[in-house]
């Protein structure tokens, strides 16, 4: 009798683990039927429920989310966001979190996808590669423009090279250049 009880105790958790998916879906139908879904929600963003059948409202950045609740509006984070646990519980004892942006280099639902862009920066929702033209050098400009010609050349901050001779000439004629303020 003890062996039957022990076997039952060991098999029940194994059965429950097999029933739960990575998405924590509960009571999912064998086949999705869109007629079983609630009417289409009117919200800013929607995501598929944990079963992958029906669209539900998604929580936005900074809003409360639940990782283990399925089929309820506003409980899952939208694309490009993930549910960051906040070590708190609601009145029912369910753990909740706050929707936060995906870390750089990841995108999609729950930030599961990896960005394959050359720059490593992609849209957190879609994964589309982002380009920042103000960080890219123009191809038509001379490549030696950004190289210092001598070891005493300086930069003025506007992309122009300031030679040591020019600084010495300005310092000799300008009384302002002779007086330096002590740093605080």
UniProtKB/Swiss-Prot annotation:
Disulfide bonds join 28-51, 32-53, 37-54, 43-57, 65-83, 77-99. InterPro entries: ESM1, Growth_fac_rcpt_cys_sf, IGFBP-like. This is Endothelial cell-specific molecule 1. GO terms for cellular component: collagen-containing extracellular matrix; extracellular matrix; extracellular region. Glycans are attached at residue 156. Induction: By TNF and IL1B/interleukin-1 beta, but not IL4/interleukin-4. Residues 1-19 form the signal peptide. Gene3D superfamilies: 4.10.40.20. The keyword Membrane does not apply. GO terms for molecular function: extracellular matrix structural constituent; hepatocyte growth factor receptor binding; integrin binding. It comes from Homo sapiens (Human). The keyword Zinc does not apply. Keywords: Angiogenesis, Disulfide bond, Glycoprotein, Proteoglycan, Secreted, Signal. It comes from the Eukaryota. May contain intrachain disulfide bonds. GO terms for biological process: angiogenesis; positive regulation of cell population proliferation; positive regulation of hepatocyte growth factor receptor signaling pathway; sprouting angiogenesis. Its main location: secreted. Residues 24-102 form the IGFBP N-terminal domain. It is found in: Secreted. Monomer. Expressed in lung, on the vascular capillary network within alveolar walls, and also at lower level in kidney. It holds the Pfam family IGFBP. Involved in angiogenesis; promotes angiogenic sprouting. May have potent implications in lung endothelial cell-leukocyte interactions.
